Amino acid sequence: MRAVVLNGHGGPEVLTFADIAVPQPGPEEVVVQVRATSLNRADLLQRMGFYPDPFPGEHEVPGMEFSGRVTAMGTRVRAWNVGDEVMGIVSGGAYAEQLVV
């Protein structure tokens, strides 16, 4: 799966495309195929190193707001169905083709 990732902190040059693992939902999570995301002040501050990275690690995928469609569900999910259109705010990860919430 493709995502925009941070390779350090700085200007726009630290943003690159990368192939990362396809997310798998836990029992109470859904996978969302991201159809739209946004750029906000927190994303800019994170890129510049002035905002804590929500999930430091091998791939830091920024992005907080998203909208899309549910493509997979955990075994205990009851409020959503595959195909439902959803939107939300996460602490990071919305600049990917899919995310788990």
Specify the residue positions occupied by each region the protein language model found.
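Short structural boundary motif marking the start of a folded domain
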Residues: 1-4
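Short beta-strand-to-turn element immediately C-terminal to the catalytic PLP-Schiff-base lysine
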Residues: 6, 47, 71-72, 100-101
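Extracellular beta-rich ligand/substrate-recognition surface
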Residues: 6-14
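Residues that act as N-cap/strand-start positions at coil-to-secondary-structure junctions
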Residues: 14-17, 93
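Generic structural detector for well-ordered beta-strands
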Residues: 16-21, 100
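Glycine-rich beta-strand-centered segment in the early N-terminal region that forms part
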Residues: 21-38, 50-93
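Short, Lys/Arg- and Gly-enriched loop/turn segments at beta-strand edges
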Residues: 93-101
